[in-house]
Amino acid sequence: LIGLVGSEMCIRDSPEGDFIERIRAVIGNKTMISTSMDSHGNVSEKLAKYSDIITCYRKAPHTDALESKQRALDNLVDRLKSGKGKPKYKAWIPVPILLPGEQTSTRVEPGKSLYEKVKPIADSKGVVDAAVWVGYAWGDAPRNHAVVMTVGDNKKAVVNGAEELAQSFWDARYEFDFVAPTTTLDSALNQAFNYQKNKIDNKPFIISDMGDNPTAGGAGDVTWTLDKLLKIKEFKSENGPELIYASIPGPDLILNALNTKIGDKVSGYVGAKVDDRFSPPVLLNGILKAVHLGDKNAEAEVVVQVGSIKVI
Protein backbone atom coordinates (compact mmCIF):
# COMPACT_ATOMS: atom_id res chain seq x y z
CA LEU A 1 0.00 0.00 0.00
CA ILE A 2 1.12 3.58 -0.54
CA GLY A 3 -1.06 5.42 1.96
CA LEU A 4 -1.89 8.32 -0.35
CA VAL A 5 -5.32 7.33 -1.63
CA GLY A 6 -8.13 9.83 -1.22
CA SER A 7 -11.86 9.20 -1.47
CA GLU A 8 -14.92 11.26 -0.64
CA MET A 9 -16.46 8.07 0.72
CA CYS A 10 -13.67 7.61 3.28
CA ILE A 11 -13.19 11.12 4.66
CA ARG A 12 -13.29 10.00 8.30
CA ASP A 13 -10.54 7.41 7.90
CA SER A 14 -8.70 6.14 4.85
CA PRO A 15 -9.42 4.08 1.75
CA GLU A 16 -6.54 1.79 2.75
CA GLY A 17 -8.12 1.35 6.17
CA ASP A 18 -11.49 0.47 4.65
CA PHE A 19 -9.78 -1.82 2.15
CA ILE A 20 -7.91 -3.83 4.75
CA GLU A 21 -10.98 -3.95 7.00
CA ARG A 22 -12.91 -5.62 4.17
CA ILE A 23 -10.05 -8.05 3.55
CA ARG A 24 -10.11 -8.93 7.22
CA ALA A 25 -13.86 -9.53 7.05
CA VAL A 26 -13.24 -12.11 4.30
CA ILE A 27 -10.19 -13.92 5.69
CA GLY A 28 -11.06 -13.71 9.38
CA ASN A 29 -8.94 -12.77 12.38
CA LYS A 30 -6.67 -15.83 12.43
CA THR A 31 -4.97 -15.11 9.11
CA MET A 32 -1.94 -12.83 9.31
CA ILE A 33 -1.63 -9.69 7.21
CA SER A 34 1.83 -8.24 6.56
CA THR A 35 1.76 -4.76 5.03
CA SER A 36 4.52 -2.91 3.16
CA MET A 37 4.17 0.82 2.54
CA ASP A 38 5.73 4.02 1.25
CA SER A 39 7.23 6.06 4.08
CA HIS A 40 5.48 9.12 2.65
CA GLY A 41 2.09 7.50 3.18
CA ASN A 42 -0.40 7.98 5.99
CA VAL A 43 -1.21 5.22 8.46
CA SER A 44 -4.68 5.54 9.93
CA GLU A 45 -5.60 3.83 13.18
CA LYS A 46 -7.81 1.40 11.25
CA LEU A 47 -4.97 0.43 8.90
CA ALA A 48 -2.71 -0.09 11.91
CA LYS A 49 -5.38 -2.13 13.69
CA TYR A 50 -5.92 -4.67 10.92
CA SER A 51 -2.25 -5.06 9.92
CA ASP A 52 -0.54 -7.70 12.05
CA ILE A 53 2.93 -6.84 10.74
CA ILE A 54 3.69 -3.55 9.03
CA THR A 55 6.78 -1.90 7.60
CA CYS A 56 7.75 0.89 5.21
CA TYR A 57 10.66 2.21 3.17
CA ARG A 58 13.69 3.32 5.16
CA LYS A 59 15.27 5.39 2.42
CA ALA A 60 14.18 8.50 0.54
CA PRO A 61 14.65 8.55 -2.42
CA HIS A 62 13.12 5.06 -2.22
CA THR A 63 16.03 2.94 -3.40
CA ASP A 64 14.95 0.24 -0.95
CA ALA A 65 11.43 -0.30 -2.32
CA LEU A 66 11.99 -3.94 -3.31
CA GLU A 67 13.98 -4.56 -0.14
CA SER A 68 11.06 -3.29 1.95
CA LYS A 69 8.57 -5.51 0.14
CA GLN A 70 10.91 -8.45 0.64
CA ARG A 71 11.14 -7.64 4.34
CA ALA A 72 7.36 -7.68 4.66
CA LEU A 73 7.26 -11.12 3.02
CA ASP A 74 10.17 -12.45 5.08
CA ASN A 75 8.51 -11.30 8.29
CA LEU A 76 5.30 -13.07 7.33
CA VAL A 77 6.99 -16.31 6.24
CA ASP A 78 9.18 -16.35 9.36
CA ARG A 79 6.17 -16.06 11.66
CA LEU A 80 4.38 -18.83 9.78
CA LYS A 81 7.33 -21.25 9.60
CA SER A 82 8.31 -20.72 13.21
CA GLY A 83 4.76 -21.21 14.40
CA LYS A 84 4.91 -17.97 16.36
CA GLY A 85 1.89 -16.57 14.58
CA LYS A 86 0.85 -12.97 15.02
CA PRO A 87 3.12 -10.66 17.03
CA LYS A 88 1.60 -10.18 20.48
CA TYR A 89 2.06 -6.42 20.72
CA LYS A 90 1.75 -3.41 18.48
CA ALA A 91 2.52 0.28 19.06
CA TRP A 92 1.01 3.02 16.89
CA ILE A 93 2.11 6.57 17.69
CA PRO A 94 0.72 9.48 15.66
CA VAL A 95 3.29 12.28 15.61
CA PRO A 96 1.87 15.81 15.02
CA ILE A 97 4.30 16.68 12.23
CA LEU A 98 3.45 17.37 8.58
CA LEU A 99 6.33 17.60 6.12
CA PRO A 100 6.53 17.40 2.30
CA GLY A 101 8.73 14.77 0.75
CA GLU A 102 11.19 17.42 -0.46
CA GLN A 103 12.16 18.05 3.16
CA THR A 104 12.58 14.46 4.28
CA SER A 105 15.49 12.94 2.38
CA THR A 106 17.34 10.25 4.31
CA ARG A 107 20.59 11.22 2.57
CA VAL A 108 20.92 14.38 4.64
CA GLU A 109 20.27 15.33 8.25
CA PRO A 110 18.10 15.02 10.23
CA GLY A 111 16.34 12.36 8.14
CA LYS A 112 19.58 10.39 7.81
CA SER A 113 20.08 10.01 11.56
CA LEU A 114 16.39 9.40 12.25
CA TYR A 115 16.09 6.52 9.82
CA GLU A 116 19.42 5.04 10.87
CA LYS A 117 17.77 4.36 14.23
CA VAL A 118 15.03 2.22 12.70
CA LYS A 119 16.98 -0.95 11.86
CA PRO A 120 18.65 -1.39 15.28
CA ILE A 121 15.24 -1.13 16.94
CA ALA A 122 13.64 -3.46 14.39
CA ASP A 123 16.45 -5.99 14.95
CA SER A 124 16.30 -5.80 18.74
CA LYS A 125 15.12 -8.77 20.79
CA GLY A 126 11.36 -9.01 21.04
CA VAL A 127 10.69 -6.72 18.06
CA VAL A 128 9.61 -7.99 14.63
CA ASP A 129 9.72 -4.68 12.77
CA ALA A 130 9.80 -0.92 13.26
CA ALA A 131 8.88 1.86 10.87
CA VAL A 132 8.66 5.64 10.57
CA TRP A 133 6.16 7.28 8.23
CA VAL A 134 6.71 10.92 7.34
CA GLY A 135 3.13 11.11 6.10
CA TYR A 136 1.51 12.56 3.01
CA ALA A 137 1.24 16.32 3.41
CA TRP A 138 -1.06 16.93 0.43
CA GLY A 139 -3.82 14.48 1.31
CA ASP A 140 -6.19 16.94 3.00
CA ALA A 141 -7.53 14.29 5.39
CA PRO A 142 -7.65 13.82 9.18
CA ARG A 143 -4.98 11.09 9.00
CA ASN A 144 -2.39 13.50 7.58
CA HIS A 145 0.48 13.27 10.05
CA ALA A 146 3.61 11.31 10.76
CA VAL A 147 3.35 7.89 12.40
CA VAL A 148 5.73 5.53 14.17
CA MET A 149 4.90 1.84 14.54
CA THR A 150 6.55 -1.20 16.06
CA VAL A 151 5.32 -4.79 16.35
CA GLY A 152 6.75 -7.67 18.35
CA ASP A 153 6.39 -10.16 21.19
CA ASN A 154 8.04 -8.18 23.99
CA LYS A 155 5.73 -5.42 25.19
CA LYS A 156 8.48 -3.31 26.76
CA ALA A 157 10.72 -3.54 23.69
CA VAL A 158 7.84 -2.69 21.36
CA VAL A 159 6.70 0.31 23.41
CA ASN A 160 10.18 1.65 24.14
CA GLY A 161 11.26 1.28 20.51
CA ALA A 162 8.25 3.18 19.20
CA GLU A 163 8.58 5.92 21.80
CA GLU A 164 12.29 6.36 21.06
CA LEU A 165 11.66 6.80 17.34
CA ALA A 166 8.69 9.10 17.88
CA GLN A 167 10.61 11.26 20.34
CA SER A 168 13.61 11.44 18.00
CA PHE A 169 11.34 12.56 15.19
CA TRP A 170 9.66 15.16 17.38
CA ASP A 171 12.96 16.51 18.71
CA ALA A 172 14.24 17.05 15.16
CA ARG A 173 11.03 18.57 13.78
CA TYR A 174 12.47 22.06 13.25
CA GLU A 175 15.63 20.77 11.56
CA PHE A 176 13.97 19.42 8.41
CA ASP A 177 14.45 21.64 5.38
CA PHE A 178 14.36 21.49 1.60
CA VAL A 179 17.17 19.43 0.08
CA ALA A 180 17.71 22.03 -2.66
CA PRO A 181 17.39 25.84 -2.84
CA THR A 182 13.80 27.04 -3.22
CA THR A 183 12.65 30.25 -4.84
CA THR A 184 10.19 31.69 -7.38
CA LEU A 185 10.20 30.76 -11.06
CA ASP A 186 11.48 34.21 -12.06
CA SER A 187 14.34 34.03 -9.59
CA ALA A 188 15.24 30.49 -10.65
CA LEU A 189 15.33 31.52 -14.31
CA ASN A 190 17.54 34.52 -13.53
CA GLN A 191 19.94 32.18 -11.76
CA ALA A 192 19.88 29.85 -14.77
CA PHE A 193 20.62 32.70 -17.19
CA ASN A 194 23.53 33.90 -15.02
CA TYR A 195 24.78 30.33 -14.75
CA GLN A 196 24.84 29.99 -18.52
CA LYS A 197 26.26 33.48 -19.09
CA ASN A 198 29.18 32.88 -16.74
CA LYS A 199 29.72 29.37 -18.15
CA ILE A 200 30.56 27.94 -14.77
CA ASP A 201 30.62 24.42 -16.26
CA ASN A 202 28.78 22.30 -18.80
CA LYS A 203 26.33 20.82 -16.33
CA PRO A 204 22.62 21.51 -16.84
CA PHE A 205 20.76 23.88 -14.53
CA ILE A 206 17.71 22.00 -13.24
CA ILE A 207 14.52 23.68 -12.06
CA SER A 208 11.93 21.39 -10.48
CA ASP A 209 8.25 22.23 -10.06
CA MET A 210 7.54 20.40 -6.83
CA GLY A 211 3.91 21.54 -6.79
CA ASP A 212 2.62 19.70 -9.86
CA ASN A 213 4.11 16.35 -8.92
CA PRO A 214 2.06 13.38 -10.21
CA THR A 215 3.88 11.00 -7.84
CA ALA A 216 2.56 13.06 -4.93
CA GLY A 217 -1.01 13.60 -6.03
CA GLY A 218 -0.53 16.42 -8.54
CA ALA A 219 -2.25 16.30 -11.92
CA GLY A 220 1.04 16.46 -13.78
CA ASP A 221 -0.58 18.50 -16.54
CA VAL A 222 -0.61 22.02 -15.10
CA THR A 223 0.48 24.41 -17.87
CA TRP A 224 1.27 27.48 -15.76
CA THR A 225 5.05 27.06 -15.93
CA LEU A 226 5.16 26.11 -19.61
CA ASP A 227 2.95 29.07 -20.52
CA LYS A 228 5.30 31.44 -18.66
CA LEU A 229 8.38 29.99 -20.35
CA LEU A 230 6.95 30.30 -23.85
CA LYS A 231 6.37 34.04 -23.29
CA ILE A 232 9.95 34.82 -22.22
CA LYS A 233 11.85 36.70 -24.93
CA GLU A 234 15.13 34.85 -24.40
CA PHE A 235 13.47 31.62 -25.55
CA LYS A 236 11.67 33.05 -28.58
CA SER A 237 14.54 32.38 -31.01
CA GLU A 238 15.76 28.88 -31.84
CA ASN A 239 19.26 30.23 -31.13
CA GLY A 240 18.32 31.17 -27.57
CA PRO A 241 19.32 29.28 -24.42
CA GLU A 242 18.46 25.60 -24.79
CA LEU A 243 15.69 24.57 -22.42
CA ILE A 244 14.24 21.07 -22.11
CA TYR A 245 10.75 20.99 -20.61
CA ALA A 246 10.01 17.54 -19.22
CA SER A 247 7.16 16.95 -19.56
CA ILE A 248 3.48 17.65 -20.33
CA PRO A 249 0.66 15.30 -21.43
CA GLY A 250 -0.66 16.13 -24.89
CA PRO A 251 -2.65 13.33 -26.55
CA ASP A 252 -4.03 15.66 -29.24
CA LEU A 253 -0.56 16.87 -30.17
CA ILE A 254 0.72 13.28 -30.13
CA LEU A 255 -1.86 12.26 -32.73
CA ASN A 256 -0.82 15.15 -34.96
CA ALA A 257 2.87 14.35 -34.48
CA LEU A 258 2.45 10.70 -35.45
CA ASN A 259 1.25 11.91 -38.84
CA THR A 260 4.12 14.37 -39.24
CA LYS A 261 7.69 13.87 -40.48
CA ILE A 262 10.63 14.66 -38.23
CA GLY A 263 11.72 18.23 -38.96
CA ASP A 264 8.30 19.39 -40.14
CA LYS A 265 5.98 21.78 -38.34
CA VAL A 266 3.41 20.40 -35.93
CA SER A 267 0.84 21.97 -33.64
CA GLY A 268 -1.64 20.96 -30.98
CA TYR A 269 -2.89 21.73 -27.50
CA VAL A 270 -1.21 20.22 -24.45
CA GLY A 271 -1.97 20.03 -20.75
CA ALA A 272 -4.75 21.21 -18.45
CA LYS A 273 -7.16 18.37 -19.14
CA VAL A 274 -7.08 17.35 -15.49
CA ASP A 275 -6.19 20.62 -13.76
CA ASP A 276 -7.00 23.89 -15.52
CA ARG A 277 -7.47 26.03 -12.40
CA PHE A 278 -4.35 28.12 -12.93
CA SER A 279 -3.78 27.94 -16.66
CA PRO A 280 -5.70 26.62 -19.70
CA PRO A 281 -4.40 24.19 -22.35
CA VAL A 282 -1.41 25.62 -24.22
CA LEU A 283 -1.14 25.61 -28.01
CA LEU A 284 2.29 24.46 -29.17
CA ASN A 285 3.36 25.49 -32.67
CA GLY A 286 6.79 24.15 -33.40
CA ILE A 287 9.11 21.70 -35.13
CA LEU A 288 8.83 17.97 -34.50
CA LYS A 289 12.29 16.89 -33.30
CA ALA A 290 11.75 13.30 -32.15
CA VAL A 291 9.20 10.51 -31.76
CA HIS A 292 9.55 7.54 -29.41
CA LEU A 293 7.12 4.63 -29.38
CA GLY A 294 6.82 1.70 -27.00
CA ASP A 295 6.99 3.17 -23.51
CA LYS A 296 4.77 0.93 -21.36
CA ASN A 297 3.08 3.91 -19.72
CA ALA A 298 3.16 6.77 -22.21
CA GLU A 299 2.97 4.52 -25.31
CA ALA A 300 4.08 7.44 -27.48
CA GLU A 301 6.36 10.38 -26.68
CA VAL A 302 7.36 13.30 -28.90
CA VAL A 303 9.65 16.30 -28.67
CA VAL A 304 8.46 19.59 -30.15
CA GLN A 305 10.77 22.61 -30.36
CA VAL A 306 9.24 26.06 -29.96
CA GLY A 307 11.92 28.74 -30.16
CA SER A 308 14.77 27.32 -28.10
CA ILE A 309 12.46 25.29 -25.85
CA LYS A 310 12.23 21.55 -26.47
CA VAL A 311 8.99 20.28 -24.97
CA ILE A 312 8.60 16.57 -24.24
Indicate residue ranges for each PLM-predicted region.
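Single conserved hydrophobic/aromatic residue that forms the stacking wall/gate
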Residues: 1-6, 10-11
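Internal, active-site/partner-interface "lid" segment
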Residues: 80-111
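Acidic, His- and aromatic-enriched active-site or binding-groove loops in soluble protein domains
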Residues: 53-70
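Charged helix-capping and loop-helix junction motifs
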Residues: 14-20, 221-225
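A short helix->loop->beta-strand "cap" motif at the edges of active sites that frequently abuts
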Residues: 25-32
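Short, structured coil segments at secondary-structure junctions
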Residues: 5-6, 29, 49-51
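Glycine-rich, charge-decorated loop segments at or immediately adjacent to ligand/cofactor-binding or catalytic sites
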Residues: 35-52, 253-258
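Hard-cation-handling environments
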Residues: 99-312
